Amino acid sequence: MDGWLRLRPMRPLLLIPLLLTTAHAAFEELAPGLFLSRGTCNTYLLREGDAALLIDPGDATALADLEQIGVKKIEQVLLTAHHREVLQGIEKLDRRVTQVAAPKDEQAFLETPSDFRKWRPKNGDKFSVNGSSYLRPPGQPVKVDRWLADGDIIEWHGRQIRCVSTPGHSPGGMSYVLGDQIFLGGVMHDGAKMTNWFDTEWDYGFGKGLDALIASVDKLAALAPKTAFSSHGPVIADASAQLAAFKTKLADFRPDYIRGYPVNNLSKRGPHPATRPTAAQYIVQVSPHLYMFGPEMAGKNFAIIIADNGHALLLDCGLFPRLVLEQIIRDMKKHLGLKQIDACWISHSHGDHFTLADVLQEQGVKFWTLDSIVDKCENPRAYDYPAMITSYGVNFERTKIDRVLKAGDVIEWEGYKLHIDWMPGQTEFGNALWLELDGKKVVFTGDNLFGDPADPEQNGHECVNARNSAIIEEGYLIAAKYLQKLQPDIIMGAHGVLMTEPKAFIDRYHDWALRIIAQYKALLPDEDYEYGYDPYWVSAYPYRVDLSTQDTQTVQITVRNFRSREQKHRIVLQTPPGIISEPEVLEGTVAAESRQTFPVTLKLEIREKQPAGVQIVPFDITLDSRHYGQLFDFILMAKE
C-alpha cells in the first residue's frame, strides 16, 4: 500500500469530466480514472491500476461492483465530514488493506460520538443550539488512521491531493483539491445551493455557521476551480462561477436571517415612553392595570395584570433570582394593590419563561398553557429541542401545568375575557393571549417578535432556528397573518419588550416572512425545501429512551411528508448490539402534506453486556426511491 506521505513524480491530471459519463454497474465514469457511485452520498473513486482511493464511502453500496471497473483494493478513504450519511458503510471496508483519513477538527465527533448526545442537555453544551446538538455523528466510533489539517498534502500514486479546511456545512469539514478540481463535500450543491440548512445552524440565530460557510465558499472560490464534486447532487461543471454566485446568495440572505431588530441592545434599552415608574422596585406601569419590568431588568421575563380586586395574572416569569421575585411581590402588595397572583400563563415551550415556576407554585399560583406546549414543560427531556427547562440548570426538572388551554378558548377572569390562540413563530409550540384592557387591545406574543415599531428599518422577527420546530410557513408567517388580522394596539413581547402602534411593524414582519421563505427555496435543492430545512421530519418520542430500569420501552416514530402526493418510506432503526427493535424496519406510506406516527418496541436482551451511558440510534431513511441514509437519531441508556 502507498504510504500517506510517500512522494512520487507528478503525473498530468486527467480529471476533465467527460461530456457523457460511462456506466459501470453502480459507477459512472466521469473522466479517465475518476468514477462516481451514488448512494446515501456521492462516493468518488480515483483508480490507479487495480487500486483505488475513495472520497466519502457513503453506505458502501459501490463496493460490490469494484471488480467491474477493475479495482481489487481500496487503499485509502478520505472523509469530508463526520455526518453519518457520508460514512455509514465504513465498517464494510477491509481495514487490513484500507486506511482512513479524516479532518482533525472532527476527531472527537468520530472517536467519541456519544459525547455529543446529552442525557441532560444544557444551554452551554458545545456544538449545540441551547442544548440541541447540531452534530450528526456516527452511531459507533470510527477508526481513523490519519487526521488531516488545513494545507496537508496526500500523496497517492503520483497525485498530490491538497487538504483545504472548509467549515460551514460541518464544524471541521474538509475539501480536497486535485489540480483545478475540488471535492468539496457538503459545502455547496450544484445550482449554487446549500446541501441542507440544518447542518449550518450552529447558534441561536447569530449566524456563526452561516459566516463559516461564507468564508469557506470564498476560500474555495479563490482557488478558481473548473469542476467541483459535491457530496450530493450533480457534478458542478462551472465551479468558479457557481461558488461566486453562491457567496452572493449567502451574503444577500444573511441580513434577513439575522434578527429583525438590534438584538444586542435588548438588555441595554432605556425607559419606554409609554410607561411610567412605580414605587415597586423594577416595575413600570403600561396602563392602569398592566405592569412590566423596567429597563433595569430588560431581557428578563415578567409582565402582570392586576385587577381592581387585587387578583393578578402573570404573563411569563423567569430569568431572574427568587429573591427579586419575592421582593417585587412584597412591593406590589404594598404599592400596587396586589393581593393574590392567581395564575401564570406560559407563552411557549422555552424554559426561560418559567424558571420561577417552583417559587410561584409554593405560593399557590397555577400555571396555564396551550395543550401543544404542556408536555414540553412536564417532560422536557423527551424532546431534542433547544432551551427546554432542564437546560437552565440542575435545579430545573419539569413544571406541572394546572390548566390545559386550547386554541380558541376564551377565559373569563376578573371581568376580562382572555382569548387564547395558537401562535407559532420562533417555535411551533407557542400561543398568544389577548384581551381588551384599559381601552386597548393588548396581545402577549412571547418571543415571536421584538423591536421598535417606530424604526422603519426593523421588522421585528426573532431568531430563525429550525431546531425550534419552526418552518417559516408554519411559524412566523402564521404569526404575522394572525397579528394583521388581530390589529392590536399594544404588543407585549416577552423579555420586557413593549411595542406600541405596531401596524406598519406587523406589515414589515409579514413581508420579511414571505421574503425569507423565497430565499430558503432558492438556497435549498429539494423541490420541497423543508426536507433540507427541518431536522425533525423523522423523529422519536421520547427522544431519550430510558432502559436502565426496565427492559422494554415503546417509542413513537413520527414521519413527516411535505410533498403534495403520497410518500413511501422505509426506515431502519440502527439499534446498538443487544437492543432489539420490533419492528426493526418501518415500511409504509404517509398521505400528502401530513405526518404519521408508528409505534416501535425496544427490548433489552442482556443488561450486563450493555455499556454505560448514552447510545445513539440512527434512523436509516429511504423516501420513495431515494436513500437519504442515517440523517436523524434518538438516544437510549441501558446502564447509567
Model regions: which residues?
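Short solvent-exposed strand-capping/beta-turn motif centered on an Asx-Ser/Thr pair
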Residues: 548, 560-566
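Low-complexity, acidic Ser/Thr/Pro/Gly-rich terminal tails and inter-domain linkers that flank the onset
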Residues: 517-548
